Amino acid sequence: MSLVTQSYSAGIEKAVNAAREATPLVHCLTNTVVQNVTANVLLAAGQAPAMVDHPGEAATFAQIASGVLVNTGTVAPHQVESMPLAAEAAVKAGVPWVLDPVAIGALEVRTSLAHRLLELAPTAIRGNASEISALAGLGAGGRGVDATDSVDDALPAAASLAERTGAVVAVSGKRDLIVWDRDGEIRALWLESGHDLMPRVIGTGCALGATMAGYASIAPALESLFSDATCAPIDAKALAVLSAHAHFGAAGQLAGVRAGHPGSFAVAWIDALDELSGADIAARVRVTEASA
């Protein structure tokens, strides 16, 4: 384990354990393709899922949830109405919410919606490189849900979004990038974990956004870690987002050992999300500092 990884591993371990102990209730306004997968993933990760997207209920439920996911993967009229209502209610209630701007850039309705949501103070933003670049106004989007830009190339876009919104910005790819603004200084980390089969399983990215919302809800409980010299200097929100990615990636690594094809991998991955302890997860990932 590298010295940089070791300095973050104590925080990751404690964050994973804290999230499991809290069993956060995650309100998911997400696309219809991944609702079942997302619910199963949240349960395996120690969280509780809810899918409340009726315009008459979304705001009310957002106020009582632990965390909220707003995912633009499908934009039916009732979802377009519900998503801003839920985000506004979450902010008013002090509930963290995650924006996942799926497939924005080339498609007008979801792109307009995502930019509207961006103004509603998301706690965290997650997407692939093309989505993050498009959200920042520095790219045209990818091929549907698939990125056509590299994670490395998305660093300026992620930094721009973090500086503008105060959100922790996560860019998913072969290695994940976590970017945040710490007292006016952009900080960035690379996280290496996961497995090559993960992009071939539906919902791995969308379910990550939901899991991030649950992890973000325990950020206040992580503040006490920063008096501990064994933990690296990282904001509590950023540590929560980093730990959600570590949980997913470590489970992907273990699933890749047990399964060789997408169908069996999906089952093995959900099992691994449930099985791995905080210490197991921290030991399986590699964290390095990125130059922002």
Question: Which residues are covered by each model-predicted region?
Answer:
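Glycine-rich phosphate/adenosyl-contacting loop at the front of the ribokinase-like
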Residues: 1-51
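Charged C-terminal helix
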Residues: 7-10, 225-232, 249-292
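General beta-strand structural signal in soluble alpha/beta enzymes
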Residues: 28, 50-52, 97-101, 125-129, ...
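Active-site cofactor/substrate anionic-group-binding motifs, chiefly glycine-
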Residues: 41-93
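Glycine/small-residue-rich loop that forms an oxyanion/phosphate-binding "nest" at active or ligand-binding sites
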Residues: 79-128
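Conserved phosphate/ATP/ADP-binding segment of small-molecule kinases
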Residues: 109-188
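Short, small-residue alpha-helix embedded
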Residues: 134, 202-231, 236-246
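Short pre-catalytic strand/loop immediately N-terminal to key active-site residues, enriched for Gly-Thr
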Residues: 191-204
